């Protein structure tokens, strides 16, 4: 039997809830490997893809979310990606409002969610007055700071029910550098079906579609207890295909009679060593950019 998963996050959650259930929290785990999508899409028709990610288990506070978002951004920047956009969302926003200050019949919650995701203002109005009250959430979409002002104005009209979430969003955004574009789409649900109060997607200039996503969620333990967590997944195949993250190997030529211990140390530092077997061997011809002179590395 061959089993392939479309998402490693669930497997990491199971490990955290079983084999690592007694480990100190917050628990930080990372992973990488191939996954198989259940269905392809038009933007990415290939079904197999690489998934790289990290999870912080035991809390879904804004401090934990800030750490996760920051680590993901630094990982992309470390691979040479620029023109990064981070899109924030509040996946369970409609459920939260429908159960509180803006009541909806249970049968309406799904249709309201769908029309907000589609930004279908006319369809929302057609659902009735209760659904139409959610129209300002469509307008609270776009560049982060302007969208946040509109979301805050909407929240003021419903008695500040979202004040804690709005403060958390601002706290998460605060340490993100000005070279990163921030946007907000508070009602986006696509690919965030299991996230709770916070979610985010990554985009980069020159690439079609998202290159990663993450957010807060719950892990179910065998005893039924739910544990909060937050994490991210990156899908680096499009980046790898165009050469991001690749490093040219550092090759150093070791002449006859070289210091063997120094050569061993260089290999430990990541150098590719090419040892001479005769006086005729030529470092540059063998693809080396440096040579070992005594105990010093020297460029040709």
Regions found by a protein language model. Give the residues of each.
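Poly-acidic low-complexity segments
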Residues: 87-90, 116, 120, 185, ...
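Short internal beta-strands
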Residues: 85-89, 254-255
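Short, conserved phosphate-binding/catalytic loop or strand-edge motifs used
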Residues: 48-52, 88-96
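Positively charged, Gly/Ser-enriched RNA/tRNA-binding surfaces
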Residues: 9-23, 29-81, 127-300
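Hydrophobic alpha-helical bundle cores within soluble ligand-binding/oligomerization subdomains
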Residues: 79, 85-87, 113
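Short terminal or interdomain "cap/linker" segment that borders an active site or interface and mediates
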Residues: 91-125
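Active-site-adjacent beta-strand anchor residues
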Residues: 5-6, 87
């Amino acid at each position: 039997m061959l089993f392939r998963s479309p998402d490693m996050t669930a497997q990491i959650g199971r490990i955290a809830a079983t084999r690592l259930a007694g480990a100190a929290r917050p628990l930080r785990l990372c992973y990488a490997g191939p996954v198989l999508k259940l269905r392809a899409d038009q933007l990415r028709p290939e079904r197999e893809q690489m998934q790289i990610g990290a999870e912080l288990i035991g809390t879904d506070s804004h401090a934990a979310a800030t750490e996760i978002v920051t680590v993901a951004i630094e990982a992309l920047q470390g691979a040479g990606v620029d023109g990064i956009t981070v899109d924030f969302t509040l996946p369970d926003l409609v459920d939260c409002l429908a159960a509180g200050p803006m009541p909806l019949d249970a049968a309406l919650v799904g249709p309201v969610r769908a029309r907000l995701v589609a930004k279908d203002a006319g369809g929302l109005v057609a659902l009735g007055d209760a659904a139409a009250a959610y129209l300002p959430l469509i307008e609270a979409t776009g560049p982060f700071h302007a969208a946040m002002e509109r979301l805050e104005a909407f929240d003021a009209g419903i008695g500040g029910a979202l004040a804690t979430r709005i403060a958390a969003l601002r706290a998460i955004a605060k340490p993100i550098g000005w070279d990163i574009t921030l946007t907000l789409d508070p009602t986006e649900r696509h690919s965030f079906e299991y996230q709770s109060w916070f979610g985010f997607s990554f985009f980069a200039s020159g690439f079609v579609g998202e290159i990663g996503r993450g957010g807060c969620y719950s892990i179910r333990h065998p005893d039924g207890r739910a544990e909060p967590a937050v994490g991210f997944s990156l899908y680096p195949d499009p980046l790898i295909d165009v050469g991001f993250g690749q490093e040219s190997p550092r090759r150093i030529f070791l002449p006859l009679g070289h210091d063997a211990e120094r050569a061993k140390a260089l290999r430990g530092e990541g150098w590719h060593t090419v040892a001479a077997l005769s006086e005729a061997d030529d470092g540059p011809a063998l693809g080396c950019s440096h040579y070992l002179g005594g105990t010093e590395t020297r460029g040709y």
